[in-house]
Amino acid sequence: MGKIIGIDLGTTNSCVAVLEGGESVVIPNKEGARTTPSVVGFSKTGERLVGQVAKRQAITNPDRTVISIKRHMGTDYKVKIDDKNYTPQEISAMILQKLKADAEAYLGEPVTQAVITVPAYFTDSQRQATKDAGAIAGLEVMRIINEPTAAALAYGIDKGEDQTILVYDLGGGTFDVSILELGDGLFEVKATSGNNRLGGDDFDEKIINWMIAEFKKETGVDLRGDKMAMQRLKEAAEKAKIELSGVMSTNINLPFITATADGPQHLDMTLTRAKFDELTADLVEMTMGPTRQALQDAKLEPKDIDKVILVGGSSRIPAVQEAIRKYLGKEPFKGINPDEVVAMGAAIQAGVLGGEVKGIVLADVTPLSLGIETLGGICTVLIPRNTTIPTSKSETFTTAADNQTSVEVHVLQGERKLASQNKTLGRFHLSGIAPAPRGIPQIEVKFDIDANGIVHVSAKDKATGNEQKITITASTGLSKEEIERMIKDAELHAEEDRKRQEEVEIRNQADSMVYQAEKTLKDLGDKAEAADKAKIESAKEELKKALEGTDMEEIKKKTEALTTVVYELSTKLYQQASAPGAGPEGASGGFGGENKKDDNVVDADYTVIDDDKKKT
Protein backbone atom coordinates (compact mmCIF):
# COMPACT_ATOMS: atom_id res chain seq x y z
CA MET A 1 0.00 0.00 0.00
CA GLY A 2 1.26 3.50 -0.90
CA LYS A 3 1.77 6.31 1.57
CA ILE A 4 -1.25 8.10 3.03
CA ILE A 5 -0.54 11.83 3.16
CA GLY A 6 -1.86 14.38 5.66
CA ILE A 7 -3.28 17.61 4.23
CA ASP A 8 -4.16 20.87 5.94
CA LEU A 9 -6.45 22.50 3.36
CA GLY A 10 -6.36 26.07 4.64
CA THR A 11 -8.17 29.29 3.77
CA THR A 12 -4.97 31.25 3.10
CA ASN A 13 -2.28 28.57 2.91
CA SER A 14 -2.25 24.79 2.65
CA CYS A 15 0.34 22.27 3.80
CA VAL A 16 1.03 18.57 3.18
CA ALA A 17 2.98 16.14 5.36
CA VAL A 18 3.84 12.46 5.48
CA LEU A 19 5.06 10.01 8.09
CA GLU A 20 8.67 8.90 7.51
CA GLY A 21 10.41 6.62 9.98
CA GLY A 22 7.78 7.35 12.59
CA GLU A 23 8.29 11.12 12.26
CA SER A 24 5.89 13.57 10.67
CA VAL A 25 7.67 15.42 7.84
CA VAL A 26 6.37 18.48 5.98
CA ILE A 27 6.68 18.05 2.21
CA PRO A 28 8.07 21.13 0.42
CA ASN A 29 6.33 22.15 -2.79
CA LYS A 30 8.06 22.35 -6.18
CA GLU A 31 8.95 25.97 -5.47
CA GLY A 32 10.78 24.88 -2.30
CA ALA A 33 8.31 26.38 0.21
CA ARG A 34 6.77 24.39 3.07
CA THR A 35 3.30 25.91 2.65
CA THR A 36 1.35 26.63 -0.55
CA PRO A 37 -0.98 29.64 -0.95
CA SER A 38 -4.59 28.46 -1.34
CA VAL A 39 -4.95 30.56 -4.47
CA VAL A 40 -6.12 29.53 -7.95
CA GLY A 41 -5.66 31.75 -11.00
CA PHE A 42 -6.76 31.46 -14.61
CA SER A 43 -4.49 33.21 -17.12
CA LYS A 44 -5.87 35.03 -20.16
CA THR A 45 -4.72 32.08 -22.30
CA GLY A 46 -6.72 29.63 -20.17
CA GLU A 47 -3.78 28.22 -18.23
CA ARG A 48 -4.64 27.19 -14.68
CA LEU A 49 -2.27 28.43 -11.98
CA VAL A 50 -2.18 27.19 -8.39
CA GLY A 51 -0.21 28.35 -5.35
CA GLN A 52 2.55 30.96 -5.37
CA VAL A 53 2.39 31.54 -9.16
CA ALA A 54 -1.35 32.26 -8.85
CA LYS A 55 -0.79 34.62 -5.92
CA ARG A 56 1.94 36.52 -7.81
CA GLN A 57 -0.34 37.34 -10.74
CA ALA A 58 -3.35 38.29 -8.59
CA ILE A 59 -2.65 42.05 -8.68
CA THR A 60 -2.73 42.23 -12.48
CA ASN A 61 -5.46 39.59 -12.85
CA PRO A 62 -7.87 40.06 -9.90
CA ASP A 63 -11.03 39.04 -11.81
CA ARG A 64 -9.58 35.65 -12.70
CA THR A 65 -7.97 34.84 -9.34
CA VAL A 66 -9.79 32.92 -6.59
CA ILE A 67 -8.77 33.34 -2.93
CA SER A 68 -10.18 32.09 0.40
CA ILE A 69 -12.51 29.58 -1.31
CA LYS A 70 -12.67 27.57 1.93
CA ARG A 71 -15.06 30.20 3.31
CA HIS A 72 -17.64 29.06 0.73
CA MET A 73 -17.38 25.28 1.25
CA GLY A 74 -20.77 23.66 1.71
CA THR A 75 -22.64 26.55 0.05
CA ASP A 76 -24.11 27.04 -3.43
CA TYR A 77 -21.51 29.75 -4.19
CA LYS A 78 -20.04 29.62 -7.72
CA VAL A 79 -16.98 31.25 -9.27
CA LYS A 80 -17.55 32.32 -12.88
CA ILE A 81 -14.48 32.31 -15.11
CA ASP A 82 -15.21 32.96 -18.79
CA ASP A 83 -18.30 30.84 -19.54
CA LYS A 84 -17.78 28.25 -16.82
CA ASN A 85 -19.07 28.16 -13.23
CA TYR A 86 -16.77 26.48 -10.69
CA THR A 87 -18.01 25.16 -7.33
CA PRO A 88 -15.92 25.60 -4.15
CA GLN A 89 -15.28 21.83 -4.32
CA GLU A 90 -13.71 22.15 -7.80
CA ILE A 91 -11.49 25.09 -6.83
CA SER A 92 -10.42 23.27 -3.64
CA ALA A 93 -9.70 20.16 -5.74
CA MET A 94 -7.27 22.19 -7.86
CA ILE A 95 -5.34 23.10 -4.69
CA LEU A 96 -5.44 19.46 -3.54
CA GLN A 97 -4.17 18.31 -6.96
CA LYS A 98 -1.17 20.61 -6.58
CA LEU A 99 -0.44 19.24 -3.07
CA LYS A 100 -0.89 15.68 -4.37
CA ALA A 101 1.55 16.31 -7.26
CA ASP A 102 4.13 17.85 -4.88
CA ALA A 103 3.83 14.83 -2.57
CA GLU A 104 4.25 12.43 -5.51
CA ALA A 105 7.36 14.30 -6.68
CA TYR A 106 8.81 14.15 -3.15
CA LEU A 107 7.97 10.49 -2.49
CA GLY A 108 8.68 9.26 -6.02
CA GLU A 109 5.49 7.21 -6.12
CA PRO A 110 1.78 7.74 -6.84
CA VAL A 111 -0.35 9.05 -3.96
CA THR A 112 -4.03 8.07 -3.89
CA GLN A 113 -5.05 8.36 -0.22
CA ALA A 114 -5.15 11.24 2.24
CA VAL A 115 -6.33 12.44 5.63
CA ILE A 116 -7.70 15.98 5.26
CA THR A 117 -8.32 18.38 8.13
CA VAL A 118 -11.27 20.74 8.55
CA PRO A 119 -12.13 23.37 11.17
CA ALA A 120 -13.71 21.72 14.21
CA TYR A 121 -16.78 23.91 13.75
CA PHE A 122 -17.38 22.83 10.14
CA THR A 123 -20.94 21.65 9.53
CA ASP A 124 -21.85 18.34 7.94
CA SER A 125 -22.28 19.94 4.50
CA GLN A 126 -18.85 21.61 4.75
CA ARG A 127 -17.24 18.27 5.70
CA GLN A 128 -19.01 16.50 2.84
CA ALA A 129 -17.86 19.24 0.43
CA THR A 130 -14.25 18.73 1.60
CA LYS A 131 -14.55 14.99 1.00
CA ASP A 132 -15.98 15.65 -2.48
CA ALA A 133 -13.05 17.99 -3.26
CA GLY A 134 -10.65 15.18 -2.37
CA ALA A 135 -12.49 12.77 -4.68
CA ILE A 136 -12.39 15.28 -7.57
CA ALA A 137 -8.62 15.65 -7.02
CA GLY A 138 -8.18 11.88 -7.33
CA LEU A 139 -7.74 11.23 -3.61
CA GLU A 140 -9.53 8.68 -1.48
CA VAL A 141 -10.19 10.63 1.72
CA MET A 142 -9.47 8.06 4.42
CA ARG A 143 -10.52 10.37 7.24
CA ILE A 144 -11.68 13.93 7.84
CA ILE A 145 -10.31 15.16 11.17
CA ASN A 146 -10.66 18.43 13.04
CA GLU A 147 -7.76 20.87 12.81
CA PRO A 148 -7.34 21.44 16.59
CA THR A 149 -7.37 17.67 17.13
CA ALA A 150 -4.67 17.24 14.47
CA ALA A 151 -2.59 19.93 16.18
CA ALA A 152 -2.97 18.12 19.50
CA LEU A 153 -1.81 14.88 17.86
CA ALA A 154 1.34 16.57 16.54
CA TYR A 155 2.01 18.18 19.93
CA GLY A 156 1.19 15.22 22.17
CA ILE A 157 2.44 12.22 20.19
CA ASP A 158 5.59 11.95 22.34
CA LYS A 159 4.18 13.28 25.62
CA GLY A 160 3.82 10.59 28.26
CA GLU A 161 2.19 12.51 31.10
CA ASP A 162 -1.55 13.13 31.44
CA GLN A 163 -2.51 16.71 30.65
CA THR A 164 -5.42 18.90 29.62
CA ILE A 165 -4.67 21.15 26.67
CA LEU A 166 -6.53 23.97 24.98
CA VAL A 167 -5.93 24.38 21.24
CA TYR A 168 -6.60 27.91 19.98
CA ASP A 169 -6.76 27.81 16.17
CA LEU A 170 -7.08 31.16 14.38
CA GLY A 171 -6.60 30.54 10.66
CA GLY A 172 -7.14 32.64 7.57
CA GLY A 173 -10.91 32.29 7.50
CA THR A 174 -12.04 30.19 10.46
CA PHE A 175 -11.60 30.07 14.23
CA ASP A 176 -11.79 27.00 16.49
CA VAL A 177 -11.00 26.24 20.09
CA SER A 178 -10.87 22.68 21.41
CA ILE A 179 -10.12 21.24 24.82
CA LEU A 180 -8.52 17.80 24.92
CA GLU A 181 -7.32 15.37 27.55
CA LEU A 182 -4.10 13.55 26.66
CA GLY A 183 -2.70 10.46 28.33
CA ASP A 184 -1.49 6.92 27.54
CA GLY A 185 -2.00 7.37 23.80
CA LEU A 186 -5.60 8.57 24.22
CA PHE A 187 -6.49 11.92 22.67
CA GLU A 188 -9.98 12.70 23.92
CA VAL A 189 -11.74 15.88 22.87
CA LYS A 190 -13.83 17.18 25.76
CA ALA A 191 -15.37 20.21 24.03
CA THR A 192 -15.06 22.31 20.91
CA SER A 193 -16.42 25.67 19.83
CA GLY A 194 -15.69 28.24 17.17
CA ASN A 195 -16.74 30.60 14.40
CA ASN A 196 -16.57 29.61 10.73
CA ARG A 197 -16.67 33.25 9.60
CA LEU A 198 -13.76 34.65 11.62
CA GLY A 199 -10.09 34.58 10.68
CA GLY A 200 -7.00 36.40 9.49
CA ASP A 201 -8.87 37.70 6.43
CA ASP A 202 -11.05 39.77 8.79
CA PHE A 203 -7.96 41.32 10.41
CA ASP A 204 -6.70 42.20 6.89
CA GLU A 205 -10.09 43.73 6.09
CA LYS A 206 -9.82 46.07 9.10
CA ILE A 207 -6.47 47.37 7.80
CA ILE A 208 -7.86 47.72 4.25
CA ASN A 209 -10.83 49.76 5.50
CA TRP A 210 -8.49 51.99 7.51
CA MET A 211 -6.21 52.56 4.49
CA ILE A 212 -9.18 53.37 2.23
CA ALA A 213 -10.59 55.86 4.76
CA GLU A 214 -7.22 57.55 5.32
CA PHE A 215 -6.50 57.76 1.58
CA LYS A 216 -9.95 59.24 0.91
CA LYS A 217 -9.34 61.87 3.61
CA GLU A 218 -6.04 62.84 1.97
CA THR A 219 -7.04 62.73 -1.71
CA GLY A 220 -10.83 62.51 -1.88
CA VAL A 221 -10.50 59.28 -3.90
CA ASP A 222 -12.38 56.12 -2.88
CA LEU A 223 -10.33 53.10 -3.95
CA ARG A 224 -13.14 50.56 -3.49
CA GLY A 225 -14.20 50.68 -7.14
CA ASP A 226 -10.70 49.87 -8.42
CA LYS A 227 -10.19 46.09 -8.40
CA MET A 228 -6.47 46.24 -9.08
CA ALA A 229 -5.95 48.80 -6.31
CA MET A 230 -8.03 46.65 -3.92
CA GLN A 231 -5.83 43.62 -4.66
CA ARG A 232 -2.73 45.70 -3.91
CA LEU A 233 -4.33 46.93 -0.67
CA LYS A 234 -5.12 43.33 0.33
CA GLU A 235 -1.52 42.22 -0.18
CA ALA A 236 -0.21 45.29 1.68
CA ALA A 237 -2.63 44.70 4.58
CA GLU A 238 -1.56 41.06 4.95
CA LYS A 239 2.12 42.09 4.87
CA ALA A 240 1.53 44.84 7.47
CA LYS A 241 -0.34 42.44 9.77
CA ILE A 242 2.53 39.94 9.61
CA GLU A 243 5.19 42.64 10.20
CA LEU A 244 3.35 44.05 13.22
CA SER A 245 3.81 40.73 15.00
CA GLY A 246 7.51 41.57 15.23
CA VAL A 247 7.78 45.39 15.13
CA MET A 248 5.91 48.29 16.73
CA SER A 249 5.14 50.11 13.46
CA THR A 250 5.29 49.44 9.72
CA ASN A 251 5.32 51.62 6.63
CA ILE A 252 2.77 50.91 3.88
CA ASN A 253 3.99 52.37 0.59
CA LEU A 254 2.02 51.78 -2.62
CA PRO A 255 3.21 54.09 -5.41
CA PHE A 256 0.87 54.86 -8.33
CA ILE A 257 -2.12 53.34 -6.51
CA THR A 258 -4.43 55.45 -8.71
CA ALA A 259 -4.51 58.55 -10.90
CA THR A 260 -6.60 61.75 -10.80
CA ALA A 261 -6.75 64.97 -12.83
CA ASP A 262 -3.79 66.13 -10.71
CA GLY A 263 -1.70 63.16 -11.86
CA PRO A 264 -0.64 59.85 -10.26
CA GLN A 265 -1.49 59.34 -6.58
CA HIS A 266 0.68 57.40 -4.14
CA LEU A 267 -0.33 55.75 -0.86
CA ASP A 268 2.22 56.18 1.91
CA MET A 269 1.12 55.50 5.50
CA THR A 270 2.50 54.29 8.80
CA LEU A 271 0.48 51.79 10.82
CA THR A 272 1.46 51.31 14.46
CA ARG A 273 0.80 48.18 16.45
CA ALA A 274 -1.31 50.24 18.87
CA LYS A 275 -3.54 51.42 16.01
CA PHE A 276 -3.78 47.87 14.63
CA ASP A 277 -4.80 46.61 18.10
CA GLU A 278 -7.44 49.34 18.27
CA LEU A 279 -8.81 48.44 14.80
CA THR A 280 -9.04 44.73 15.58
CA ALA A 281 -10.01 44.73 19.28
CA ASP A 282 -13.55 43.52 18.50
CA LEU A 283 -12.18 40.59 16.45
CA VAL A 284 -9.88 39.49 19.28
CA GLU A 285 -12.83 39.65 21.70
CA MET A 286 -14.91 37.56 19.25
CA THR A 287 -12.40 34.72 19.71
CA MET A 288 -12.78 34.79 23.48
CA GLY A 289 -16.52 33.96 23.43
CA PRO A 290 -16.01 30.46 21.96
CA THR A 291 -12.99 29.99 24.28
CA ARG A 292 -15.19 30.62 27.33
CA GLN A 293 -17.93 28.41 25.84
CA ALA A 294 -15.54 25.49 25.32
CA LEU A 295 -14.34 25.68 28.93
CA GLN A 296 -17.92 25.82 30.15
CA ASP A 297 -18.93 22.81 28.01
CA ALA A 298 -15.92 20.85 29.29
CA LYS A 299 -16.87 21.85 32.87
CA LEU A 300 -13.40 23.26 33.45
CA GLU A 301 -11.87 26.46 34.84
CA PRO A 302 -8.92 28.32 33.24
CA LYS A 303 -6.66 26.98 36.04
CA ASP A 304 -7.42 23.39 34.91
CA ILE A 305 -5.66 23.91 31.55
CA ASP A 306 -2.08 22.62 31.56
CA LYS A 307 -0.99 23.88 28.13
CA VAL A 308 -2.27 26.33 25.51
CA ILE A 309 -1.35 25.42 21.93
CA LEU A 310 -1.52 28.14 19.27
CA VAL A 311 -2.42 27.12 15.72
CA GLY A 312 -2.89 29.15 12.54
CA GLY A 313 -0.83 32.07 11.25
CA SER A 314 -3.08 34.70 12.85
CA SER A 315 -2.42 33.26 16.33
CA ARG A 316 0.95 35.08 16.08
CA ILE A 317 -0.81 38.46 16.50
CA PRO A 318 0.48 39.91 19.82
CA ALA A 319 -2.98 41.16 20.93
CA VAL A 320 -4.39 37.67 20.40
CA GLN A 321 -1.65 36.10 22.52
CA GLU A 322 -2.11 38.74 25.21
CA ALA A 323 -5.88 38.08 25.38
CA ILE A 324 -5.28 34.33 25.83
CA ARG A 325 -2.54 34.95 28.41
CA LYS A 326 -4.80 37.29 30.36
CA TYR A 327 -7.86 35.00 30.35
CA LEU A 328 -6.13 31.66 30.98
CA GLY A 329 -3.27 32.97 33.11
CA LYS A 330 -0.75 30.95 31.10
CA GLU A 331 1.93 31.68 28.55
CA PRO A 332 0.95 30.03 25.23
CA PHE A 333 3.24 27.19 24.13
CA LYS A 334 5.31 28.24 21.11
CA GLY A 335 7.37 25.11 20.47
CA ILE A 336 5.56 24.20 17.26
CA ASN A 337 5.10 25.96 13.92
CA PRO A 338 1.45 27.11 13.81
CA ASP A 339 1.42 26.95 9.98
CA GLU A 340 2.59 23.33 9.80
CA VAL A 341 1.36 21.58 12.95
CA VAL A 342 -2.09 20.69 11.56
CA ALA A 343 -0.68 18.93 8.48
CA MET A 344 1.83 17.11 10.70
CA GLY A 345 -1.01 15.89 12.92
CA ALA A 346 -2.96 14.75 9.83
CA ALA A 347 0.10 12.74 8.75
CA ILE A 348 0.18 11.06 12.19
CA GLN A 349 -3.51 10.14 11.81
CA ALA A 350 -2.64 8.80 8.34
CA GLY A 351 0.06 6.70 10.01
CA VAL A 352 -2.50 5.35 12.49
CA LEU A 353 -4.82 4.36 9.63
CA GLY A 354 -1.92 2.86 7.66
CA GLY A 355 -0.71 0.81 10.63
CA GLU A 356 2.60 2.68 10.99
CA VAL A 357 1.64 4.26 14.33
CA LYS A 358 0.42 2.04 17.16
CA GLY A 359 -1.14 2.80 20.53
CA ILE A 360 -2.94 6.01 19.52
CA VAL A 361 -6.68 6.37 20.10
CA LEU A 362 -8.39 9.52 18.86
CA ALA A 363 -11.80 10.36 20.34
CA ASP A 364 -13.23 13.44 18.63
CA VAL A 365 -16.61 15.12 19.10
CA THR A 366 -19.41 16.53 16.98
CA PRO A 367 -19.23 20.34 17.14
CA LEU A 368 -22.95 21.08 16.78
CA SER A 369 -26.15 19.44 18.04
CA LEU A 370 -28.14 17.27 15.62
CA GLY A 371 -31.88 16.85 15.63
CA ILE A 372 -35.12 16.90 13.66
CA GLU A 373 -38.04 19.29 13.31
CA THR A 374 -41.09 18.29 15.37
CA LEU A 375 -44.61 19.69 15.81
CA GLY A 376 -44.71 23.47 16.13
CA GLY A 377 -41.42 24.03 14.27
CA ILE A 378 -39.34 22.96 17.26
CA CYS A 379 -35.83 21.47 16.86
CA THR A 380 -35.72 18.26 18.93
CA VAL A 381 -32.09 17.32 19.60
CA LEU A 382 -31.04 13.67 19.33
CA ILE A 383 -27.28 14.13 19.57
CA PRO A 384 -26.06 17.10 21.67
CA ARG A 385 -22.92 19.00 20.69
CA ASN A 386 -19.58 17.69 22.02
CA THR A 387 -20.79 14.06 21.86
CA THR A 388 -17.85 11.73 21.18
CA ILE A 389 -17.89 10.29 17.65
CA PRO A 390 -18.47 7.87 16.05
CA THR A 391 -21.86 7.62 17.74
CA SER A 392 -25.41 6.40 17.19
CA LYS A 393 -28.66 7.56 18.79
CA SER A 394 -32.30 6.70 18.13
CA GLU A 395 -35.59 8.09 19.39
CA THR A 396 -39.23 7.19 18.74
CA PHE A 397 -41.64 9.78 17.35
CA THR A 398 -45.28 9.60 16.24
CA THR A 399 -47.69 11.22 13.78
CA ALA A 400 -49.22 14.68 14.24
CA ALA A 401 -52.52 14.01 12.41
CA ASP A 402 -55.10 11.21 12.16
CA ASN A 403 -54.59 8.63 9.38
CA GLN A 404 -51.24 10.16 8.40
CA THR A 405 -49.53 7.76 5.96
CA SER A 406 -46.22 9.59 5.47
CA VAL A 407 -43.90 11.84 7.44
CA GLU A 408 -41.18 14.23 6.36
CA VAL A 409 -37.98 13.98 8.37
CA HIS A 410 -36.29 17.40 8.45
CA VAL A 411 -32.69 16.93 9.67
CA LEU A 412 -31.15 19.93 11.46
CA GLN A 413 -27.78 20.99 12.88
CA GLY A 414 -27.35 23.82 15.37
CA GLU A 415 -28.06 25.09 18.87
CA ARG A 416 -31.25 27.14 18.41
CA LYS A 417 -34.65 26.01 19.75
CA LEU A 418 -36.59 26.78 16.57
CA ALA A 419 -36.02 24.62 13.49
CA SER A 420 -36.02 27.66 11.18
CA GLN A 421 -33.04 29.14 13.03
CA ASN A 422 -30.81 26.08 12.55
CA LYS A 423 -29.05 24.73 9.46
CA THR A 424 -30.98 22.27 7.32
CA LEU A 425 -28.84 19.24 6.52
CA GLY A 426 -31.48 17.44 4.49
CA ARG A 427 -35.07 16.22 4.20
CA PHE A 428 -36.54 12.84 3.32
CA HIS A 429 -39.94 11.12 3.42
CA LEU A 430 -41.02 7.90 5.10
CA SER A 431 -44.21 6.67 3.43
CA GLY A 432 -46.40 3.58 3.77
CA ILE A 433 -47.35 4.21 7.41
CA ALA A 434 -50.51 2.26 8.33
CA PRO A 435 -53.48 4.68 8.81
CA ALA A 436 -54.17 5.21 12.51
CA PRO A 437 -55.22 7.92 14.93
CA ARG A 438 -52.50 10.46 15.62
CA GLY A 439 -50.10 9.47 18.36
CA ILE A 440 -50.47 5.73 17.66
CA PRO A 441 -47.84 4.98 14.95
CA GLN A 442 -44.31 4.57 16.27
CA ILE A 443 -41.56 5.92 14.03
CA GLU A 444 -37.98 5.31 15.10
CA VAL A 445 -35.54 7.96 13.90
CA LYS A 446 -31.88 6.96 14.13
CA PHE A 447 -28.81 9.18 13.73
CA ASP A 448 -25.34 7.77 13.02
CA ILE A 449 -22.25 9.97 12.90
CA ASP A 450 -19.15 8.30 11.46
CA ALA A 451 -15.52 9.00 12.34
CA ASN A 452 -15.41 11.73 9.66
CA GLY A 453 -18.25 13.57 11.40
CA ILE A 454 -20.58 12.83 8.47
CA VAL A 455 -24.21 12.14 9.34
CA HIS A 456 -26.39 9.18 8.31
CA VAL A 457 -30.11 9.21 9.22
CA SER A 458 -32.80 6.54 9.02
CA ALA A 459 -36.53 6.47 9.86
CA LYS A 460 -38.46 3.23 10.43
CA ASP A 461 -42.16 2.53 10.97
CA LYS A 462 -42.14 -0.09 13.74
CA ALA A 463 -45.56 -1.46 12.71
CA THR A 464 -44.86 -2.10 9.01
CA GLY A 465 -41.07 -2.32 9.06
CA ASN A 466 -40.87 0.29 6.28
CA GLU A 467 -37.52 2.07 6.44
CA GLN A 468 -35.91 5.00 4.69
CA LYS A 469 -32.22 5.90 4.98
CA ILE A 470 -30.09 8.78 3.75
CA THR A 471 -26.51 9.91 4.04
CA ILE A 472 -26.78 13.62 4.46
CA THR A 473 -25.65 15.55 1.42
CA ALA A 474 -26.99 19.05 1.90
CA SER A 475 -29.03 20.76 -0.80
CA THR A 476 -25.79 22.47 -1.83
CA GLY A 477 -23.92 19.15 -2.02
CA LEU A 478 -22.85 17.39 -5.19
CA SER A 479 -24.51 14.30 -6.63
CA LYS A 480 -22.45 11.21 -7.44
CA GLU A 481 -22.80 12.01 -11.16
CA GLU A 482 -21.57 15.59 -10.64
CA ILE A 483 -18.55 14.37 -8.68
CA GLU A 484 -17.72 11.83 -11.41
CA ARG A 485 -18.01 14.54 -14.08
CA MET A 486 -15.73 16.81 -12.05
CA ILE A 487 -13.20 14.00 -11.53
CA LYS A 488 -13.05 13.48 -15.32
CA ASP A 489 -12.76 17.23 -15.82
CA ALA A 490 -9.92 17.42 -13.27
CA GLU A 491 -8.12 14.49 -14.95
CA LEU A 492 -8.51 16.20 -18.31
CA HIS A 493 -7.04 19.41 -16.91
CA ALA A 494 -4.18 17.44 -15.33
CA GLU A 495 -3.46 15.93 -18.77
CA GLU A 496 -3.67 19.40 -20.35
CA ASP A 497 -1.26 20.75 -17.73
CA ARG A 498 1.12 17.86 -18.41
CA LYS A 499 0.98 18.51 -22.18
CA ARG A 500 1.49 22.23 -21.64
CA GLN A 501 4.54 21.54 -19.47
CA GLU A 502 5.88 19.15 -22.11
CA GLU A 503 5.39 21.83 -24.80
CA VAL A 504 7.25 24.37 -22.67
CA GLU A 505 10.15 21.92 -22.22
CA ILE A 506 10.28 21.20 -25.99
CA ARG A 507 10.30 24.93 -26.78
CA ASN A 508 12.94 25.64 -24.12
CA GLN A 509 15.14 22.89 -25.53
CA ALA A 510 14.71 24.32 -29.04
CA ASP A 511 15.50 27.88 -27.89
CA SER A 512 18.57 26.58 -26.10
CA MET A 513 19.73 24.80 -29.27
CA VAL A 514 19.26 27.95 -31.38
CA TYR A 515 21.37 29.88 -28.86
CA GLN A 516 24.00 27.11 -28.83
CA ALA A 517 24.19 27.12 -32.64
CA GLU A 518 24.61 30.91 -32.78
CA LYS A 519 27.31 30.77 -30.09
CA THR A 520 29.13 27.95 -31.93
CA LEU A 521 29.17 29.90 -35.21
CA LYS A 522 30.44 33.02 -33.43
CA ASP A 523 33.17 31.12 -31.53
CA LEU A 524 34.40 29.27 -34.62
CA GLY A 525 34.76 32.38 -36.77
CA ASP A 526 36.94 31.46 -39.79
CA LYS A 527 37.97 28.06 -38.41
CA ALA A 528 35.02 26.26 -40.01
CA GLU A 529 34.40 25.85 -43.72
CA ALA A 530 31.69 28.00 -45.30
CA ALA A 531 29.67 24.94 -46.38
CA ASP A 532 29.57 23.60 -42.80
CA LYS A 533 28.53 26.99 -41.44
CA ALA A 534 25.81 27.27 -44.09
CA LYS A 535 24.42 23.88 -42.99
CA ILE A 536 24.10 25.09 -39.38
CA GLU A 537 22.63 28.43 -40.47
CA SER A 538 20.03 26.66 -42.60
CA ALA A 539 19.05 24.17 -39.85
CA LYS A 540 18.87 27.01 -37.32
CA GLU A 541 16.52 29.10 -39.49
CA GLU A 542 14.29 26.07 -40.09
CA LEU A 543 14.02 25.52 -36.33
CA LYS A 544 13.23 29.20 -35.69
CA LYS A 545 10.47 28.99 -38.29
CA ALA A 546 9.08 25.83 -36.63
CA LEU A 547 9.07 27.65 -33.27
CA GLU A 548 6.63 30.19 -34.72
CA GLY A 549 4.07 27.39 -35.13
CA THR A 550 2.38 24.96 -32.73
CA ASP A 551 3.48 21.60 -34.21
CA MET A 552 5.51 20.08 -31.36
CA GLU A 553 6.65 17.11 -33.44
CA GLU A 554 8.02 19.47 -36.10
CA ILE A 555 9.89 21.50 -33.44
CA LYS A 556 11.37 18.29 -31.99
CA LYS A 557 12.41 17.12 -35.48
CA LYS A 558 14.08 20.44 -36.37
CA THR A 559 15.78 20.60 -32.94
CA GLU A 560 17.27 17.15 -33.54
CA ALA A 561 18.40 18.19 -37.05
CA LEU A 562 20.17 21.30 -35.72
CA THR A 563 21.70 19.32 -32.85
CA THR A 564 23.08 16.79 -35.36
CA VAL A 565 24.78 19.35 -37.67
CA VAL A 566 26.28 21.29 -34.74
CA TYR A 567 27.58 18.05 -33.22
CA GLU A 568 29.00 16.87 -36.58
CA LEU A 569 30.91 20.13 -37.11
CA SER A 570 32.22 20.15 -33.54
CA THR A 571 33.40 16.53 -33.92
CA LYS A 572 35.05 17.29 -37.29
CA LEU A 573 36.98 20.27 -35.90
CA TYR A 574 38.05 18.33 -32.82
CA GLN A 575 39.40 15.48 -34.97
CA GLN A 576 41.30 17.95 -37.16
CA ALA A 577 42.80 19.60 -34.11
CA SER A 578 43.85 16.26 -32.66
CA ALA A 579 45.44 14.95 -35.88
CA PRO A 580 49.31 14.69 -36.21
CA GLY A 581 50.76 17.78 -37.88
CA ALA A 582 47.84 19.97 -36.96
CA GLY A 583 48.69 23.66 -36.76
CA PRO A 584 48.98 25.81 -33.66
CA GLU A 585 45.21 26.27 -33.74
CA GLY A 586 44.72 22.61 -32.88
CA ALA A 587 43.85 21.65 -29.37
CA SER A 588 47.08 19.67 -28.98
CA GLY A 589 48.91 20.23 -32.28
CA GLY A 590 52.69 20.50 -32.73
CA PHE A 591 53.80 17.50 -30.68
CA GLY A 592 54.13 15.06 -33.59
CA GLY A 593 55.60 17.32 -36.35
CA GLU A 594 59.17 18.36 -37.17
CA ASN A 595 60.51 20.37 -34.29
CA LYS A 596 62.67 22.90 -36.14
CA LYS A 597 64.76 25.05 -33.83
CA ASP A 598 64.44 28.81 -34.21
CA ASP A 599 67.86 30.49 -34.66
CA ASN A 600 66.92 33.26 -32.24
CA VAL A 601 66.13 30.92 -29.37
CA VAL A 602 68.87 30.77 -26.74
CA ASP A 603 69.08 27.71 -24.50
CA ALA A 604 69.28 28.70 -20.84
CA ASP A 605 71.93 27.22 -18.53
CA TYR A 606 70.68 25.85 -15.26
CA THR A 607 72.12 23.99 -12.25
CA VAL A 608 70.31 21.33 -10.22
CA ILE A 609 70.55 22.04 -6.51
CA ASP A 610 70.35 19.05 -4.22
CA ASP A 611 67.81 20.04 -1.56
CA ASP A 612 69.21 17.51 0.89
CA LYS A 613 72.60 19.24 0.91
CA LYS A 614 70.97 22.56 1.73
CA LYS A 615 69.50 21.24 4.96
CA THR A 616 71.43 21.95 8.14
Curated annotation (Swiss-Prot):
It holds the Pfam family HSP70. Induction: By stress conditions e.g. heat shock. GO terms for molecular function: ATP binding; ATP-dependent protein folding chaperone; unfolded protein binding. Residues 583-593 have a biased composition (Gly residues). The modification Phosphothreonine is found at T174. Acts as a chaperone. Keywords: ATP-binding, Chaperone, Nucleotide-binding, Phosphoprotein, Stress response. Residues 576-616 are annotated as: Disordered. This is Chaperone protein DnaK. Belongs to the heat shock protein 70 family. It comes from Heliobacterium modesticaldum (strain ATCC 51547 / Ice1).
